[in-house]
């Protein structure tokens, strides 16, 4: 019986391989997905930016927080997940569907959802650490405040084409910053549980 159990455990571990760790691993496929999401956002461009310049706004992207080295492992994973979740929520709306090419929008939402699923393996163990909950909340609240400002802006501009174009460019900045964070996490051994 012990031999059969050992054999089954070995098969499970082998089947996961280096790209499908039981822990928290951002594979090369995850990074390719992040780059593809940026390309999709670039392809969603429908307007020349010139008529929309007067609608520009500084939304206060917490770029230093995301791209810098100030986040600890649990904070970085939580911030990355929150940014992707908020971006998904932004584009997975009725207003967004009316503004963009449906095929590109669906591909973007699918890509964001896949990245979120990849990160869920990382977020589970982190969320169980009660003593660091307060340390994660500050950065997460900063991300939520950033996206709340974006939602308010869209509503104030009545979801105009120019407003969506400004947001598309802003989301390219945000996803580019989150990609930088993902690369930093991956360089630290690839396995986020080892950070």
Swiss-Prot record:
Main localization category: secreted
Protein's cellular compartments: Secreted
Transmembrane segments: none
The organism's place on the tree of life at top rank: Eukaryota
Residues that carry a glycan: 101
Pfam families: Interferon (PF00143)
Cysteine disulfide partners in this protein: 24-122, 52-162
Entry's Gene Ontology BP terms: adaptive immune response; B cell activation involved in immune response; defense response to virus; female pregnancy; humoral immune response; natural killer cell activation involved in immune response; positive regulation of biosynthetic process; response to exogenous dsRNA
Hydrolase in keyword set: no
Keyword Glycoprotein in record: yes
Tissue expression per record: Constitutively and exclusively expressed in the mononuclear cells of the extraembryonic trophectoderm.
Gene Ontology MF, one: hormone activity
Signal peptide (from-to): 1-23
Keywords, comma-separated and alphabetical: Antiviral defense, Cytokine, Disulfide bond, Glycoprotein, Hormone, Pregnancy, Secreted, Signal
GO cellular component terms, semicolon-separated: extracellular space
PANTHER family in UniProt: INTERFERON OMEGA-1, TYPE I INTERFERON
Protein task: Paracrine hormone primarily responsible for maternal recognition of pregnancy. Interacts with endometrial receptors, probably type I interferon receptors, and blocks estrogen receptor expression, preventing the estrogen-induced increase in oxytocin receptor expression in the endometrium. This results in the suppression of the pulsatile endometrial release of the luteolytic hormone prostaglandin F2-alpha, hindering the regression of the corpus luteum (luteolysis) and therefore a return to ovarian cyclicity.
Family under the similarity heading: Belongs to the alpha/beta interferon family. IFN-alphaII subfamily.
Remaining remarks: IFN-tau genes are intronless. They evolved from IFN-omega genes in the ruminantia suborder and have continued to duplicate independently in different lineages of the ruminantia. They code for proteins very similar in sequence but with different biological potency and pattern of expression.
Protein name per the record: Interferon tau-1
Organism this protein belongs to: Bos taurus
Lineage summary: Eukaryota, Metazoa, Chordata, Craniata, Vertebrata
